[in-house]
């Protein structure tokens, strides 16, 4: 017989050995991660992924690094006068310039200077700076360009298809040189575009080039080795067997000395980017990925725009057959291209037009365009879309509408698909030294040239993401 004392001792030991098995189990509390969506979204700002997929509030997307949302808002500022197919530039003095057709002396193209960069109130000024002793009065295609390396302002006028003249200023328009003649007798001159590249020329720090729609099955181009004072012969701006048609989007020069331009492919199908590495002596064709997107069937169907960032990466933008805006990039000077990305916001746009593209530092890019909202009323608004992490597999896109809901830039039927009021044939876009995007276009209902921009948003310059200095809201108050 087992003694009672031994039984009690055994039970006591069993109790101690099993007490931990039936006690309360400590559960580690899950600490919620802070959301990147920690700010309010303005009514006319949209955060989205490619193909108009809404991204707002999506914490499962693992947004990080440069691919994160930043507060953004868009607005515009009037130049106080009309414009037609406005081109623009920015000088090292932080002055914005826009062409203004017919508003200069003797009916010339005005070169309008605005001190908008860095404003804290709407007390800004815009005034014509083109006032030479003998102004060039007749201009069928007004065009200005600012050399991003030297700040030389180039005024480039076409005269009734018969010839072109070039004038330039090295002091923000205080004085003008020229005109020089930029014309060859063997071709008509139409739809010109001009740019400089960071290639040392014989008599000037940069090489200049222009291209035209002339008497050839593709654009003709000419280069200058002395900053635009004299010009070489107009030669093929594409492979000599190319049949792309002569209408070209804006020419652009690169940090590596290359020039690029975009238009229809040499077969007449799709869009291509054309590149010269030797100031126009020879050109190569680099087809864009338009097999799925198709190409626009509109007045400005040649508008396959191209731009380069500070590292020489190439960005292209075009309208597809569905009239939506598409983007592709190349990191090897156009040899290969990323898949096409549809960049419109998730707001049911029925179509877009007048595309322009600009790039800041490596991996940043912004797009300007006009768009029609679906509905019974024909309403055209202006938009800017950007990404700060362009080479991400799923880049976050941010789009702002520049005009208010009750302030459309036009209400004409199919405005974005045709030559429409002051929008003309094309628009223009640049990034200033601080990383703010500026988009030159026309507010057709008010008949004013306007600069569209982000009054709130991140900089497209610098290694890290920083916010721009906030600017006052412009809009109708500036018309």
Tell me what each language-model feature is:
Residues 1-35, 477-479:
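Secretory targeting signatures
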């Amino acid at each position: 017989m087992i003694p009672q004392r031994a039984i009690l001792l055994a039970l006591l030991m069993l109790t101690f050995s099993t007490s931990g098995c039936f006690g309360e189990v400590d559960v580690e509390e899950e600490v919620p991660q802070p959301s990147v969506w920690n700010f309010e979204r303005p009514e006319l700002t949209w955060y989205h992924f490619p193909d108009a997929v809404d991204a707002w509030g999506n914490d499962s997307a693992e947004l990080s690094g440069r691919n994160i949302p930043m507060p953004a808002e868009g607005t515009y500022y009037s130049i106080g006068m009309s414009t037609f197919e406005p081109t623009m530039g920015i000088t090292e003095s932080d002055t914005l310039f826009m062409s203004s057709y017919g508003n200069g002396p003797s009916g010339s193209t005005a070169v309008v200077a605005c001190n908008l960069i860095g404003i804290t109130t709407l007390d800004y000024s815009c005034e014509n700076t083109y006032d030479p002793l003998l102004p060039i009065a007749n201009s069928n295609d007004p065009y200005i360009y600012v050399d991003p390396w030297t700040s030389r302002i180039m005024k480039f006028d076409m005269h009734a298809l018969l010839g072109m003249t070039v004038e330039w200023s090295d002091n923000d328009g205080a004085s003008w040189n020229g005109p020089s003649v930029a014309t060859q007798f063997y071709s008509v001159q139409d739809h010109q575009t001009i740019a400089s590249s960071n290639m040392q020329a014989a008599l000037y720090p940069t090489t200049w080039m222009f291209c035209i729609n002339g008497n050839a099955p593709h654009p003709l181009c000419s280069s200058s080795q002395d900053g635009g004072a004299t010009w070489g012969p107009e030669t093929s701006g594409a492979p000599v067997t190319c049949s792309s048609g002569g209408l070209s989007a804006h020419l652009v020069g690169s940090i590596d000395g290359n020039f690029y331009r975009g238009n229809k492919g040499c077969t007449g199908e799709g869009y291509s980017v054309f590149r010269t590495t030797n100031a126009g002596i020879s050109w190569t064709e680099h087809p864009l990925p338009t097999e799925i997107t198709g190409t626009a069937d509109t007045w400005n169907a040649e508008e396959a725009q191209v731009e380069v960032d500070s590292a020489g990466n190439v960005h292209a933008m075009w309208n597809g057959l569905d009239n939506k805006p598409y983007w592709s990039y190349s990191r090897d000077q156009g040899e290969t291209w990323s898949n096409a990305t549809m960049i419109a916001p998730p707001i049911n746009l029925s179509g877009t037009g007048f595309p322009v593209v600009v790039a800041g530092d490596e991996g940043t890019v912004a797009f300007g365009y006009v768009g029609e909202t679906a509905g019974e009323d024909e309403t055209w608004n202006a938009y800017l879309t950007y990404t700060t992490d362009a080479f991400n597999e799923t880049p976050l896109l941010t789009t702002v509408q520049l005009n208010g809901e009750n302030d459309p830039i036009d209400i004409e039927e199919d405005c974005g698909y045709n030559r429409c009021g002051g929008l003309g044939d094309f628009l223009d876009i640049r990034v200033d030294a601080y990383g703010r995007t500026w988009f030159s276009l026309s507010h057709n209902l008010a008949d004013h040239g306007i600069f569209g921009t982000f009054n709130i948003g991140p900089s497209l310059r610098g290694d890290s993401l920083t916010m721009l200095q906030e600017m006052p809201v412009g809009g109708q108050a500036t018309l």
